[in-house]
Amino acid sequence: MIKWPWKVQESAHQTALPWQEALSIPLLTCLTEQEQSKLVTLAERFLQQKRLVPLQGFELDSLRSCRIALLFCLPVLELGLEWLDGFHEVLIYPAPFVVDDEWEDDIGLVHNQRIVQSGQSWQQGPIVLNWLDIQDSFDASGFNLIIHEVAHKLDTRNGDRASGVPFIPLREVAGWEHDLHAAMNNIQEEIELVGENAASIDAYAASDPAECFAVLSEYFFSAPELFAPRFPSLWQRFCQFYQQDPLQRLHHANDTDSFSATNVH
């Protein structure tokens, strides 16, 4: 029998957090009871260690907080919560937000412009999100804002900037870079053939290695059936890094559902 961590001594808490309801999103339904229990344990610690800061009138209730924490902890389910130790706050806008962006062109001229962002991740600062895109991250669709920004945090543990290569053994770096760049080239070829809107993988993945790692991390957890057959070698590297196999998890869940359906009387 599974002992759910949020059910232990609930009477001791003034308000028990709604973990069971928080788990009832499509992205998390494939997890086993043991995995869900472990995920909740991590998420509870996450909420104790991190500060969720609602901005611009956004209302943050306990269910929303729990779901945000669960999504943050899914990528580190087997790595451990210490992999998320590079920040202390999560800033949450109600919708995509406008920021001032400064960049330098090829001849050294500095440009300033205002751009709309869904999220941001600073190496030694907070993660910035928006609720509209967080909600869109609940489905198993290939899009997940929180996992994307977490991937950037995991990426920067390997150095001063995001490079697309997370903290892995040095002997594996060359192979990782080879497979990641091959995936970027493949995605770019598809974009040139069918256009960005018709591409089967988010075109942002072709922009640079750091974004490729972040985007494919989204697909790894929320659309493994698209990632695994297309980039099998890179898929295995992701499985080894995250110490999870979401495709195997999905197949097991589907097999269980099929077995249950055939035994209904």
From Swiss-Prot:
Residues holding Zn(2+): 111, 148, 152, 211
Keywords: Aminopeptidase, Cytoplasm, Hydrolase, Metal-binding, Metalloprotease, Protease, Zinc
UniProt organism field: Escherichia coli (strain K12)
Effect of residue 69 to S: No change in interaction with Mlc
Record annotation: effect of changing residue 204 to S: Does not affect protease activity with L-alanine-pNA as substrate. Decreases interaction with Mlc
Gene encoding the protein: mtfA
Protein known as: Mlc titration factor A
Keyword Protease: yes
A Gene Ontology BP annotation from the UniProt entry: proteolysis
Alphabetized GO MF terms: aminopeptidase activity; metallopeptidase activity; zinc ion binding
